From Swiss-Prot:
The EC number(s) this enzyme carries: 2.1.1.61, 1.5.-.-
Any GO BP annotation: tRNA methylation
Region (tRNA (mnm(5)s(2)U34)-methyltransferase): 1-245
NCBIfam families: MnmC_Cterm, PRK01747.1-1, PRK01747.1-2, PRK01747.1-3, PRK01747.1-5, tRNA_MNMC2
Protein location: Cytoplasm
Organism: Escherichia coli (strain K12)
Function: Catalyzes the last two steps in the biosynthesis of 5-methylaminomethyl-2-thiouridine (mnm(5)s(2)U) at the wobble position (U34) in tRNA. Catalyzes the FAD-dependent demodification of cmnm(5)s(2)U34 to nm(5)s(2)U34, followed by the transfer of a methyl group from S-adenosyl-L-methionine to nm(5)s(2)U34, to form mnm(5)s(2)U34.
Keywords for the protein's UniProt record, in alphabetical order: Cytoplasm, FAD, Flavoprotein, Methyltransferase, Multifunctional enzyme, Oxidoreductase, S-adenosyl-L-methionine, Transferase, tRNA processing
Name of the protein in question: tRNA 5-methylaminomethyl-2-thiouridine biosynthesis bifunctional protein MnmC
Top-level taxon of origin: Bacteria
Family classification: In the N-terminal section; belongs to the methyltransferase superfamily. tRNA (mnm(5)s(2)U34)-methyltransferase family. In the C-terminal section; belongs to the DAO family.
Named cofactor requirement(s): FAD
Region (FAD-dependent cmnm(5)s(2)U34 oxidoreductase): 270-668
Taxonomic lineage of the native organism: Bacteria, Pseudomonadati, Pseudomonadota, Gammaproteobacteria, Enterobacterales
Gene from which the chain derives: mnmC
Catalysed reactions, as listed in the record: 5-aminomethyl-2-thiouridine(34) in tRNA + S-adenosyl-L-methionine = 5-methylaminomethyl-2-thiouridine(34) in tRNA + S-adenosyl-L-homocysteine + H(+)
């Protein structure tokens, strides 16, 4: 069984207040002057003071083995801030730091360690505020208003580097080869790691490490680096520096899931909901020129227009990709929403998912068997549910303490307003009819004979995504649903958390004294007309799940207040994010894929055409991370996701899985 929690660091603080690993019997940083050693070994060893002003790209990527207390990262961040202040017009504008950590510190230990360096406090406090829970995989932290990105990969570095997507190859400008001393932690200092460092290093990229061990120098040379010794810091006689002077051949482990970006920095987004709003922000942060075309007269009139939506992860014991994606998407979403400089109604009150029948109880028991961190999810017994949620249900369940609810409509509107302040152009009542290639661009034809030409296009228009010739074969489907808006009562007002059962019920929004209860589910339907049957069924499902609960019987839907919307979904419950695949070319190129995997070409896609769709019923959870993934891909930057989970988001995945097994593929 796969476990989804990470073992925290086992440490103590010595007489000097320096953290010491009990497992490795080694200090996290020098007792003498760890800050100056970091500046000398890693910043100096990689010549960053000289390279920053001369860097020809807007992004500089640093990778590190062993995050530890974050001293190297914080020191680099401080130096990068000083560089930006001294060189505001430099080409280099953003810093991307990738680090691997098998045993992350707790937030409390991290804060205690940071007390050593008061001068780093402004940066350390931001790191502590966003410190992620101990889940495996990549945790992306957006710091300094997005100018600094930190990708924290929790797990064994030798395992993780073998799981990275090929899109990360040759992206790293500088390596910090750190960690406990080779004699103390030999399992990390392997040839596999050195080979991975070489694969990820950009031609001309550098490395520095505190050790001068001969096997390390030889291993890095064998991997492809040109190595040299340098005077060590303080009492250490020597250290190692290296440079990648050659261009190594790029491996391609799964060409059928290849992701391609664009050298252009101008894009049109088709949409008007949360997906297009968050993607606009992510692209603008990377220097793109972005135009949004919305078919409606205002934003968030589609599936993103609800008054309240629940935020919690979708978990399943039997689907590793789904667990990895949604657990990390959920934690990223909380960090993202908490730092968004816009207002929207929300309450991180927690979400409790209840076992209201034998099937749901079994499902919850399976989720709880996955060894989830308590920060993510904990079991709650039936007698404790009332204390936690405020209402009696006679059911046990699972609680997501960091979950809650938010207003998607308000979020979408205000994010788009923020994006407009940053340069986003929006055109409302522009219904895209079709699009075609013209002179290395996309020609967009709108209703009413309006036309526009753009270098790159992203389709983020929900259930209407498959209405174009390029997307008509996508295996997605529409789901119509109705959410009921009910006035609060004295009993309902006691509800303190979002309840999930065979439906969901939110606490009241203080702004309107109403709750949301829903939602009906009509697969294959796009009907948005009010339904009295749906209104009554929303109420009845609540009563059926909690037949002894008097408060449930008092739910009043008689005023017919409701909202009907249509979602876009997939049968595997995961979004579709990436290049729009070319269906016909895929069938031709991959006709013999099952027998000829070694000869496979890169996935056939439409050039400079991307999609961000099929968010289903968990868009509030998945949209922030999906926007970050797609913006990174489009910009040819590091993507915060391992290869197998990223493949599970690829729009061509359902076709490719069948083709890899030699099975026939049907459109839709």
């Amino acid at each position: 069984m796969k476990h989804y929690s990470i073992q925290p660091a086992n440490l103590e603080f010595n007489a000097e207040g320096t953290p010491v690993s009990r497992d490795f019997d080694d200090v996290y940083f020098s007792n003498d002057n760890g800050l100056e050693e970091t500046r000398y070994v890693f910043l100096g060893g990689n010549q960053l003071e000289v390279r920053f002003p001369e860097h020809p790209h807007p992004l500089f990527v640093v990778a590190e083995s062993g995050f530890g207390t974050g001293l190297n990262f914080l020191t680099l961040w401080q130096a990068f801030d000083q560089f930006r202040e001294a060189h505001p017009q430099a080409q280099l504008q953003r810093l991307h730091f990738i680090s691997f950590e098998k045993f992350p510190l707790t937030r409390a230990d991290l804060a205690l360690a940071h007390q050593h360096w008061p001068e780093l406090a402004p940066w350390a406090e931001q790191l502590q505020a966003q410190w992620p829970m101990p889940l495996p995989g990549c945790h992306r932290l957006l710091l300094d208003e997005g100018r600094v990105t930190l990708d924290l990969w929790f797990g064994d570095i030798n395992e993780l580097t073998s799981q990275l997507d090929d899109s990360l190859n040759q992206k790293v400008d500088a390596w910090f080869l750190d960690g406990f001393a080779p004699a103390k932690n030999p399992d990390m200092w392997t040839q596999n790691l050195f080979n991975a460092m070489a694969r990820l290093a950009r031609p001309g990229g550098t490395l520095a490490t505190f050790t001068s061990a001969g096997f390390v120098r030889r291993g890095l040379q064998d991997a492809g680096f040109t190595m040299q010794k340098r005077k060590g810091f303080g009492r250490k006689r020597e250290m190692l520096c290296g440079v990648m002077e050659q261009t190594l051949p790029l491996p391609c482990s799964a060409p059928w899931f290849n992701r391609t970006g664009s050298s252009k920095r101008e894009a049109a987004i088709i949409g008007g909901g949360i997906a297009s709003a968050l993607l606009s922000l992510a692209l603008l942060r990377r220097g793109w020129q972005v135009t949004l075309y919305c078919a409606d007269e205002a934003p968030a009139l589609g599936a993103s227009g609800n008054r309240q939506g629940a935020l919690y992860p979708l978990l399943s014991k039997h689907d590793e990709a789904l667990n990895r994606f949604f657990s990390n998407a959920f934690t990223f979403a909380r960090r993202f929403y908490d730092q968004l400089p816009v207002k929207f109604d929300h309450d991180w009150c927690g979400v409790t998912q209840l076992g209201w029948d034998e099937k749901s109880q079994h499902k919850i028991a399976q989720m709880l068997s996955m060894d989830l961190p308590a920060e993510l999810a904990v079991a709650v017994e039936a007698n404790a549910v009332e204390q936690i949620t405020g209402v009696a249900t006679n059911c046990s369940g699972i609680t997501y303490p960091q979950g809650g609810w938010l207003c998607p409509a308000e979020l979408t509107r205000n994010v788009l307003e923020l994006a407009q302040q940053q340069g986003l152009q929006i055109y409302y009542q522009y219904q895209l009819q079709n699009l075609s290639r013209k002179d290395d661009c996309w020609l967009l034809n709108f209703a009413g004979d309006q036309q526009a030409t753009h270098s790159v296009v992203v389709l983020a228009n929900g259930h209407q995504i498959s209405r174009f010739s390029q997307t008509s074969t996508l295996p997605v489907y529409s789901v119509a649903g109705q959410v009921s808006h009910i006035p609060t009562t004295p009993e309902l007002a006691e509800l303190k958390q979002v309840l999930c059962y065979d439906g969901y019920l939110t606490p009241q929004n203080p702004a309107n004294q109403h709750h949301c209860i829903g939602a009906s589910y009509h697969r294959g339907s796009e009907d948005t007309a009010y339904s009295e049957d749906d209104q009554q069924q929303n109420r009845q499902r609540l009563i059926d799940c909690f037949p002894q609960a008097q408060w449930a019987k008092e739910v009043d839907v008689s005023d017919k207040e409701a909202r009907c919307g249509v979602r876009c979904a997939t049968r595997d419950h995961l979004p579709m994010v990436g290049n729009v695949p070319d269906y016909e070319a895929t069938l031709v190129e991959y006709a013999s894929l099952a027998e000829q995997k070694d000869e496979a070409v890169s996935a056939p896609v439409f050039d400079d055409l991307f999609m961000f769709a099929a968010l289903g019923s968990r868009g509030l959870c998945s949209a922030p991370l999906c926007a970050e993934i797609l913006a990174a891909q489009m910009s040819d930057e590091p993507i915060p996701m391992d290869a197998s989970t990223l493949a599970a988001l690829n729009p061509n995945r359902l076709w490719v899985r069948k083709l890899l097994k030699g099975k026939a593929v049907k459109a839709g």
